[in-house]
Structures are given as C-alpha cells and as structure tokens.
A protein has these predicted regions:
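Acidic, polar-rich low-complexity tracts and alpha-helical solenoid repeat scaffolds
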Residues: 1-505
Length: 505
C-alpha cells in the first residue's frame, strides 16, 4: 500500500488492523461501497454515506487521540482525512493532513524499512494536502506542498518517484493557471526528466515549449517547438502534438513578420500532418486545414490584378472576338489553378475552413466574371474603323452599337456559366454554415453574395449544378434569405413558436 500511495483504491483501503481502528474502518468501508477503483471518492454521495464517512472520521480521530503513539496513528489520520474529503469538507481534511506532516515529519525510523514507511506516509500527506488546497482554490498552499515533494531530498528515492513527478506536474499546472509561465516551464521540464511514463513525458516536453508561446516569447517559441519536433518526429503517439507544435511556429513567425519563413512553416504544418497519421476531422486537421487554406489564399489577391479581358488593337472583328475568347480561356485556366488550390482543404473535414474554401472559390470565379463584364471593347477593330470613316455620324453610331451587341453576346455566353460556378460554391458554404450553426465573415459573405443574384438566378444555377452532380441539393426559394442588420425576416403565415412548457412539466 505504501509503495502505491497515489492509487485511489490503495489510499482508501490501507489496512488498519488494530482493534482501536476496526470499527472506524467498518464504517468507512460501508460508506465507500460502490466507489470505482480509479476514484478516491464518488462524485455524489447519499446522506447515509455522508453520515458514515463522518462517523468513520470521528472514530479514527478519537482512536488516534487515545493512542497518539500508536504505529498506525498517522495512517488512521490520513484515512480520516480521506473520509472528510469524500464529504467535501476540505478544510477539515487539510487540517488532518497538516497534523500528519507535523507529527511524522520530525520522526526518524529505527530501520530502513520503518524510514521508508514514514516517508511514504509523509509523501501521501503532502500530496493530499496539496490536492485538497488546490480544490479549495488555495493555490499558493497547494504549490507550497507540491514543491516540498518535488524539492525535498527525502522524497528523491525511487519509492517516491511517482508521487514526486505527479507533484511536479500538478505544480506546473497551477503555475500555468496563475500565468507564471516561466516557473511552469521549469517544473514541466523537471517532470519530463523524472517521469517514466512515455506519454506523460511527451506531454511535459510539449508544455515546456507551450509556455514560451504563452508568454509571447516568439523566438523562444520557435526554438522550443522546433526542439519538440526534432525530439518526437518519429513518435507515432505524438501526432497531434507534433502538428500543434508546427502550427505554433507558424504563429510565432507571423508575429515576427517573417513572411518567407512563415510560408515554409505553413508547408511544414501540412507535411507534419501528412506524416502524423492523424485523421480528417481531428484537432490536428484543424491546423493543417488552416495552413493549407492560408497557402491557397495567397493566390487570390494577385488574381484580382492579373485577370483582365482587353484584346487590344485587332485587324478584324472576327480576330477581336477570337482574342476575347482566347483571353477568357487563359484567365479561366489561371482562375482554375487558384480554385484547385483550395480543393485539398475540403479533405481535412474541418467545417470552418471548408466553408472558407468554398467562399474563396466563389470569389475567384466572380473575379473572372467581373473581368468578363468589364471587358475593354476599345480600340475598335481596324476593318470596322475603316468602314466608319466613310460613313455618316448616324451610321458610325449604328455600326458601333452593332459591334458592341455582337461582342456582348459572346461575353454573355461566357459569363453565365462562370457566375453559376460561383453561386454553387456560395450555396455549399451557406448550407454547411447552417448545418454547423457557424457564423463568421465567410458565411456572411456567402449569404450576401447569393442575395445579390436573386432567387431566379440561384435556382437556375443550382439546377445546372444538379444536372452535373445528382447529390447537390435542390434549391428552396428563400433558402438563403437573411435579414439586414437591425431588421427581422417576416414569418410565414401559420407558423408560430412552440408554447413554453409549464412549470410542472
């Protein structure tokens, strides 16, 4: 029992065999019946259990007071304190743990075995005192007790390794909660060096790096996170932490405004995720999808500058129209490259970035549509200008209008399918947002852009998309309607909010 004093069942069931404690132990066991093996106390107890715990604690304390020099007196006090913990009387439990520390601390064992037993009891008292203080929001007292376990050479032996490393980690967590990140990092580092469990050591090493991030030490974040990546790169169980560490480096690079290094760090997040074995939809996939989206999004601003429809001077009307078609085809390929860059984001199955990718794809198509709408139709083709020189002003005006109508027909043929591509992407984004109850800048953009097209055009575009993809849901009139700020949507006749349930229901 003393060798495993951090195990809940062992703590609660240490053998108190002497007659003085037998009745108290019986009461404790009755109260403790049904408690899971991995818990010190049940989450909720009945009134009967509460009375039994209190009677057990009182009986043990009375027995100790009658025989304070009894060899099992310290363990009886600890079990009495546990009984009080189970009734949420943390202050009373803390006083008993402190009493054990005061009485056992100065004692020296006559044999190595007795010394080890006293050390185990003392470690148990310090740990439970710290735990109770933490639960009682007395963080300074908790840290003080944990630091004794972590720093006192009396607890440095192998027999107390587990309780000592638990104390290091718990102290680090309290320091982190108090935003004392430097101290937290120190205790996490010591825990990583002392702990035997592989997973606990891995997490402790990561928390050391995370403390640099928390205190906004960006250079330290890069150094510590890269160190974690190097240490655990081949560890199959570190997948999520590896991706998180890679993302922290991205954030640090962004804060330092290191644009070139940020781009490389983003790509490293994607690569780390691919090697990690993490599944789509996981927490690690969130960072990978954001990284992939950010990389893809770099192509959108240049698109606004490069996509233009301006055929320039052409010898004939036919060559002018052909030049327009060629430019639109070239621009469409450029847009398609940007659109395809967002496609991998969808595979991570993270709603926020899936929606963002759909919206940005829609934006890319609308850039092309806008370029087609605003196509430059001057200068007029040479053959047309020659004809117009010999004509009257009225004829020249008529010829120019006919030319513009001819070109506009060509442009109209090109623009409608492009707009429908955009509408389909916005519709996917809006539907995903509604299904996930997500409201952000991308979802609002999707709805706003859909409303600009109107019901008839949306229905037409979605019908075209359905013809190509049977899984694409049909459009419901008003599906993407949204109230303007400060206004409400009208409620359809016959609809009403459900009645409120009565107080007795």
């Amino acid at each position: 029992c003393q060798a495993q004093q951090t195990e809940p069942r062992c703590i609660a069931q240490c053998s108190l065999t002497n007659i003085e404690f037998r009745r108290a132990v019986e009461l404790f066991n009755q109260a403790h019946e049904g408690t899971p093996a991995d818990r010190l106390c049940q989450e909720t107890i009945t009134e009967r259990q509460r009375l039994l715990y209190e009677q057990s604690a009182t009986a043990m304390v009375n027995a100790v007071n009658a025989r304070p020099d009894h060899e099992q007196a310290p363990q009886a006090l600890i079990q009495a304190a546990i009984a009080l913990e189970c009734t949420s009387r943390n202050d009373s439990a803390m006083r008993l743990y402190s009493r054990v520390i005061d009485e056992v601390g100065p004692r020296q064992g006559r044999t190595p075995e007795e010394t080890e037993a006293l050390t185990a009891i003392l470690a148990q008292a310090y740990f439970r005192l710290a735990f109770s203080a933490n639960r009682n929001f007395d963080y300074d007292s908790a840290v003080q007790s944990y630091r004794v376990l972590a720093d006192d050479r009396r607890f440095a032996g192998a027999a107390q390794r587990e309780v000592r490393t638990d104390a290091l980690i718990n102290a680090a967590r309290i320091f982190e909660y108090q935003q004392n990140y430097t101290q937290a990092a120190d205790y996490y580092r010591r825990a990583a060096e002392a702990v035997q469990d592989i997973e606990t050591r891995r997490v402790a090493h990561y928390r050391v790096a995370e403390m640099s991030y928390r205190r906004r030490d960006w250079a330290g974040t890069i150094r510590e996170m890269q160190g974690f990546l190097d240490r655990y790169r081949g560890d199959g169980g570190a997948g999520e932490l590896l991706v998180t560490a890679a993302w922290r480096i991205v954030e640090a690079r962004q804060q330092l405004r290191q644009e070139r290094d940020t781009r490389a760090a983003l790509q490293n997040v994607v690569s780390t995720y691919e090697r990690s074995g993490q599944q789509p939809g996981s927490a690690a996939a969130e960072f990978a999808s954001q990284a992939r989206f950010t990389i893809a999004n770099e192509g959108l601003p240049p698109l606004r500058e490069s996509v233009r429809v301006a055929p320039g001077r052409q010898p004939t009307v036919q060559s002018f129209v052909q030049a327009i078609r060629t430019q639109i085809d070239n621009d469409a390929r450029e847009v398609r490259t940007v659109v395809d860059g967002y496609a991998p984001v969808l595979g991570y199955r993270r709603p926020t970035w899936t929606i963002a990718a759909f919206v940005q794809q829609g934006q890319a198509y609308e850039i092309l549509a806008s370029a087609i709408i605003n196509a430059t139709l001057t200068p007029l083709p040479d053959d047309l200008q020659q004809r117009m020189r010999r004509a009257s002003a009225d004829v020249r005006s008529e010829v120019e209008l006919q030319f513009q109508d001819q070109v506009r027909q060509v442009l109209e043929e090109q623009i409608r399918p492009v707009e429908c591509f955009a509408v389909a992407r916005y519709a996917l984004a809006a539907r995903a947002a509604r299904a996930g109850a997500i409201d952000n800048e991308f979802t609002r953009t999707a709805v706003a852009r859909l409303q600009s097209y109107g019901d008839e055009r949306i229905a037409e575009c979605i019908a075209q998309q359905q013809a190509q993809d049977a899984s694409f849901g049909a459009y419901t009139p008003g599906e993407f309607q949204r109230a303007r700020p400060g206004q409400t949507l009208p409620m359809d006749p016959g609809l009403a909010a459900p009645a409120l349930a009565g107080a007795d229901e």
